[in-house]
Regions:
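Membrane-embedded alpha-helical bundles of multi-pass transporters/translocases
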Residues: 1-250
């Protein structure tokens, strides 16, 4: 579960890289040809703000929409299948986004929403999977380390954010952008950027998280706390608790 979470670190790119993609890849707005420097600056800032806002909304719709639906699906579908299916959906959607390209912003948005679905699924299901692992630990060792589960989830979250930031910095280096401009209000005209720069930054919210989602499926094929085994662990643990006089309050 921890390895899966680490390999899925690319899912944080949709939020972390949005402002950078808004600066260097997309421009949506009126034609800036012939505008004064002040009008051009205003148009560029307006585009950055709108792109960033739309990405925030799209990410929220995909992620939180999935988080609302997943609890209902958990009763009928295994955690393993939910993650694998959602990651395949995210992988395919991410690559479609990449091939649509940075010149078609609004056409990308539906697929960005679909790409964010695995983020919500992983957030929900990974917590439940950690709980199942703790059940298995308690059954086999007689000890339940809830703190270990919380620590693992916290570690994965922090590492994921760190990896996202590192990938953004790496992309700045690969595209030969000025690292000193990261986190500043510096404004550039993306229309004057080279194809390599625009596509490189665009890949941060398309192909990069897509590859991450594909990789994170690999550990799931080795996760076997599903189906009959999960039911057996749950049943035997409940019986063990009854024998030991342990009462778990709801």
């Amino acid at each position: 579960v921890v390895i899966m979470g680490i390999l899925a670190s690319g899912r944080y790119m949709y939020q972390a890289a949005a402002i950078h993609v808004a600066r260097y890849s997309f421009y949506i707005g009126k034609d800036i040809t012939g505008l004064s420097p002040e009008e051009t600056e205003q148009a560029l800032q307006s585009s950055i703000s709108l792109v960033n806002t739309v990405f925030a909304v799209a990410t929220a719709v995909g992620m939180f929409g999935a988080m609302l639906i997943v609890p209902k699906l958990i009763k009928r579908v295994s955690y393993k299948k939910l993650i694998v299916v959602s990651c395949i959906l995210g992988f395919v959607s991410s690559f479609i986004t990449f091939f649509i390209g940075y010149n078609h912003f609004w056409a990308c948005i539906p697929f960005v929403i679909l790409s964010c679905v695995p983020c919500g699924v992983i957030n929900c299901v990974s917590s439940a999977m950690v709980g199942d692992c703790l059940d298995y630990m308690e059954l086999t060792t007689g000890r339940r380390q809830n703190g270990l589960g919380n620590a693992c989830q916290s570690f994965v979250s922090k590492l994921g954010n760190a990896v996202s930031t590192s990938v953004i910095v790496l992309m700045y280096i690969l595209t030969e952008l000025d690292l000193n401009k990261i986190g500043t209000s510096y404004t550039v005209n993306p229309l004057t950027m080279s194809h390599g720069i625009r596509e490189g930054m665009f890949s941060l919210i398309s192909i990069v998280p897509g590859i991450s989602l594909l990789l994170c499926m690999i550990p799931m094929f080795f996760y076997d706390l599903t189906g009959d085994k999960k039911e057996r662990v749950t049943k035997e643990l409940a019986e063990k608790r009854v024998k030991e006089g342990i009462v778990i309050s709801e």
